[in-house]
């Protein structure tokens, strides 16, 4: 069975995507989310039933969110702080000495 979704890029947030059930149907998207997302730019249609995985999202979470709430918001992974990485490395080196 097909599970087609439309994917849109955010104009306000880099690497942020909105997956929805039907192209150009934003009726199930909360108004606050649409305002912070910006003008959605259509990226592609995708049949989730034909895929086993997605590049930057858990496909099962995407399918479940589309079924439950009618959309899935993909945000970029957090950028690791160089300071935190350095401090963690420092702590680990102190433990081994």
UniProtKB/Swiss-Prot annotation:
Highest taxon, organism lineage: Bacteria
Pfam families recorded: YcgL (PF05166)
PROSITE patterns xref list: YCGL (PS51648)
Domain YcgL: from-to ranges: 3-87
InterPro entries hit by this protein: YcgL-like_sf, YcgL_dom
Classification via PANTHER family: PROTEIN YCGL
Name of the protein: YcgL domain-containing protein PMI1171
Lineage of the organism: Bacteria, Pseudomonadati, Pseudomonadota, Gammaproteobacteria, Enterobacterales
